[in-house]
Amino acid sequence: MGGFTSIWHWVIVLLVIVLLFGAKKIPELAKGLGSGIKNFKKAVKDDEEEAKNEPKTLDAQATQTKVHESSEIKSKQES
């Protein structure tokens, strides 16, 4: 009752898959699934790298803005 723990469950599932798709179609489906997973992992990795680089850029811009604003305030106070 705990799901697919028996070997017979897996045998029946595999038999149904072979009957539905045919023996020739299964390698093509597996190849497509594998390339989809590969592309997904690559996209996740690219997003993580982009996220690592993005805060540094924002912090640098914020620091430059603060320095520029504080120098303007000092120049106004001195005049």
Swiss-Prot record:
GO terms for molecular function: protein transmembrane transporter activity. It is a single-pass membrane protein. The chain crosses the membrane at residues 1-21. Residues 48-79 are annotated as: Disordered. Gene3D superfamilies: 1.20.5.3310. It comes from the Bacteria. Pfam families: TatA_B_E (PF02416). Keywords: Cell inner membrane, Cell membrane, Membrane, Protein transport, Translocation, Transmembrane, Transmembrane helix, Transport. Residues 66-79 have a biased composition (Basic and acidic residues). The keyword tRNA processing does not apply. It is found in: Cell inner membrane. Belongs to the TatA/E family. PANTHER family: SEC-INDEPENDENT PROTEIN TRANSLOCASE PROTEIN TATA. This is Sec-independent protein translocase protein TatA. It comes from Helicobacter pylori (strain ATCC 700392 / 26695). The lineage of its organism: Bacteria, Pseudomonadati, Campylobacterota, Epsilonproteobacteria, Campylobacterales.
